[in-house]
């Protein structure tokens, strides 16, 4: 009997790949640079950007011999120039410089600038028709239809760099669109997975920041505790893969080993597994369509012992329900959802509201915005940024009454 043949083609990208990393000094950027560092002969760094960490940015520029670096804070240009004195690295500062970095010729761009500030640079990379590894949620949550349309028009390849969407991307390759019945995004359940609703309502900041599996920044860790992050991922999946809300399910999986599953018409389910390490999905993006040597630990299922799953609780975690509501409302509602959540999380961190009030502020903001009748398709990055600011202002005006109800 002949064995089933495995693909044994030459690397699709056997030469040196030119790469740029937007947000190089953040956690995603750090993981990306770690992978590039492991195989320096395969990559040439074109451009790097950072927010305000000039020392870290200059260090990376020197290590990887970057051609251009940009710091987002325009007041740091002099500091950046001084740090790069004696090198051939060109530098700039401010939004225009970051956009310039994104638009420079590169085979592959990591778009990892957080917040709305990452939208225009990501679009600049997309407009070049290059391959963009996307780690900025605002591009999809705040401008999904517009962003994906621009990518299609430019012939850009969008690769999802977060673990769940990268898992779906890999699993979706096992079938055709018309054969798909649903995708399943997994969630750890966060630190409050087994807590009663009354206890979740009163949870402290310290408790919300104790994620059981992932090491992440403060904002995303709180989003995980409220399951707002999973709501955002549902929205992202809808735009990224052109899925309806009814084609996206969420499954709580405390071990965070299975990151995404895809069910096909024949009832086959294809899943992607891996340790909870962001270097795994980033490595997939960096090597795509090839596979590169990873830096994360190998998966030892025998050591893990068991994988468990449970349905999400939309009552204890209303933020997840609100994401589906926003998707079905459309016309900018997902932008409002995201902006209101950011205002709510900032208020919780500042101890202005209880943990349970995060979802209430998001829901009240969405309802108020819908009643005002301002829904309209977003036609540009400026439209998305303007709506984001409008929603933040609306959430801020509703915040005092939400805080008063909780006191």
Swiss-Prot record:
Alphabetized InterPro entries for the sequence: DXP_reductoisomerase, DXP_reductoisomerase_C, DXP_reductoisomerase_N, DXPR_C, DXPR_C_sf, NAD(P)-bd_dom_sf
UniProt: NADPH binding residues: 25-28, 53, 136, 138, 217
Matches recorded under Pfam families: DXP_redisom_C, DXP_reductoisom, DXPR_C
Keyword list, A-Z: Isoprene biosynthesis, Manganese, Metal-binding, NADP, Oxidoreductase
Binding residues annotated for Mn(2+), in chain numbering: 162, 164, 233
EC number from the UniProt entry: 1.1.1.267
Reactions listed under catalytic activity: 2-C-methyl-D-erythritol 4-phosphate + NADP(+) = 1-deoxy-D-xylulose 5-phosphate + NADPH + H(+)
The keyword Metal-binding is assigned to this record: yes
Coiled-coil annotated residue ranges, if any: none
Top-level class of the enzyme under EC nomenclature: oxidoreductase
GO MF terms, alphabetically ordered: 1-deoxy-D-xylulose-5-phosphate reductoisomerase activity; manganese ion binding; NADPH binding
Keyword Repressor: no
SUPFAM superfamilies registered for this protein in UniProt: 1-deoxy-D-xylulose-5-phosphate reductoisomerase, C-terminal domain, Glyceraldehyde-3-phosphate dehydrogenase-like, C-terminal domain, NAD(P)-binding Rossmann-fold domains
Cofactor(s) the protein requires to work: Mg(2+); Mn(2+)
Pathway: Isoprenoid biosynthesis; isopentenyl diphosphate biosynthesis via DXP pathway; isopentenyl diphosphate from 1-deoxy-D-xylulose 5-phosphate: step 1/6
Function: Catalyzes the NADPH-dependent rearrangement and reduction of 1-deoxy-D-xylulose-5-phosphate (DXP) to 2-C-methyl-D-erythritol 4-phosphate (MEP).
Family (UniProt): Belongs to the DXR family.
Protein name as catalogued: 1-deoxy-D-xylulose 5-phosphate reductoisomerase
């Amino acid at each position: 009997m002949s064995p089933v043949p495995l693909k044994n083609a030459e690397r699709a990208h056997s030469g040196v790949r030119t790469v740029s990393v937007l947000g190089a000094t953040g956690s995603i950027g750090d993981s990306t640079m770690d992978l590039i560092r492991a195989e320096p002969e395969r990559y040439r760094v074109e451009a790097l950007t950072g927010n305000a960490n000039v020392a870290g940015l200059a260090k990376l520029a020197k290590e990887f011999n970057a051609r251009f670096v940009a710091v987002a804070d325009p007041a740091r240009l002099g500091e950046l120039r001084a740090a790069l004195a004696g090198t051939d690295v060109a530098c700039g500062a401010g939004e225009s410089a970051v956009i310039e970095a994104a638009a420079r010729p590169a085979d592959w761009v990591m778009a990892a600038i957080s917040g709305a500030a990452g939208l225009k640079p990501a679009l600049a990379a997309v407009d070049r028709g290059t391959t963009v590894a996307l780690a900025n949620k605002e591009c999809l949550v705040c401008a999904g239809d517009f962003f994906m349309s621009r990518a299609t028009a430019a012939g850009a390849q969008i690769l999802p760099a977060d673990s769940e969407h990268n898992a779906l991307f890999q699993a979706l390759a096992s079938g055709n669109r018309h054969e798909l019945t649903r995708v399943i995004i997994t969630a750890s359940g966060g630190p409050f997975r087994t807590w009663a609703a009354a206890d979740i309502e009163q949870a402290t900041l310290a408790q919300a920041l104790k994620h059981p599996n992932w090491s992440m920044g403060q904002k995303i860790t709180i989003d995980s505790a409220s399951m707002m992050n999973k709501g955002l991922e549902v929205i992202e999946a809808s735009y990224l893969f052109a899925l309806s809300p009814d084609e996206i399910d969420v499954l709580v999986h405390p071990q965070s080993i299975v990151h995404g599953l895809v069910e096909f018409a024949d009832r086959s389910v294809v899943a992607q597994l891996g340790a909870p390490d962001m270097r795994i999905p980033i490595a997939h993006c960096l090597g795509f369509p090839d596979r590169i040597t990873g830096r994360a630990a190998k998966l030892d299922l025998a050591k893990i012992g068991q994988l468990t799953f449970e349905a999400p609780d939309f009552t204890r975690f209303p933020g997840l329900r609100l994401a589906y509501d926003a998707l079905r409302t459309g016309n900018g509602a997902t932008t409002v959802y995201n902006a209101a959540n950011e205002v709510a999380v900032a208020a919780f961190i500042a101890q202005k509201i209880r943990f349970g009030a995060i979802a209430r502020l998001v829901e009240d903001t969405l309802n108020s915005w819908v009643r005002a009748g301002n829904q309209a398709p977003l036609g540009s990055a400026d439209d998305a940024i303007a709506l984001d600011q409008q929603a933040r202002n609306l959430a801020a005006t509703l915040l005092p009454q939400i805080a008063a109800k909780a006191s």
